[in-house]
Amino acid sequence: MDIEERLTWLDEEYLSHYDANEVEVHSQIQLQKPFDAVVSERRTYPITEDEPEEKHTYLSYNKVVGTVLDRELYQAFSILDYVLVSAPGAPVRQALIDAGIGEDVYGSFEDGMLQPMFSIVAKNADESDQTRFVQIIEETLQKLVKEGLNQDSLLAGINSAEFRFREADYGQFPKGLLYGLQCMESWLFDDTKPFIHLECLDTLQFLREQIKTGYFEDLIQKYLLCLLYTSPSPR
């Protein structure tokens, strides 16, 4: 391929017809407008013809949490995911399991976008349990805000996060690759903040100092107290 010939053609036939100064590109990702009220959505997913639809519903409770550029929120909700849902005996997960909602309950904090999302999911639940699912989550969260979170669980979550950061054991993946991806989580949205989530030790120490102050309970009250659930359908 004659590269010079191709580039000349591109310039003569296309690029030379435009002035770069006349092209205004709005590349900044805008914040999503918040809902005025709780929104309930129903979506279906495919299953095989011989699979029953009963007890194949996923119930999901989802909340937007600030922006990925807030380093304290970024770390704090990773800790809250552990404390509320992921740790053994975590109160929200245990409350849903004890109520017989779903065969399994798990949480996630999706932080690879401008507006991170905190989710609590009940797997293989009954569609009719939608109202109870939300009610149990919110009643449990309200109780935790009132009575306080288990401080040992908070400390364990923070210490675990610090250990994983210091160990930096990413298995088969190169450490540099994972560091680069973590940089992109903030860099994509602010050119001046590529390293805020790598510089996390000070943030974790700050969170450690907040355990007894009601900081985490205030975050639950502010951000967690919309619902999305999916149900199966034959392909």
Label every PLM stretch briefly.
Residues 1-36, 52-76, 82-231, 235:
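Charge-rich, well-structured scaffold segments of protease-associated domains
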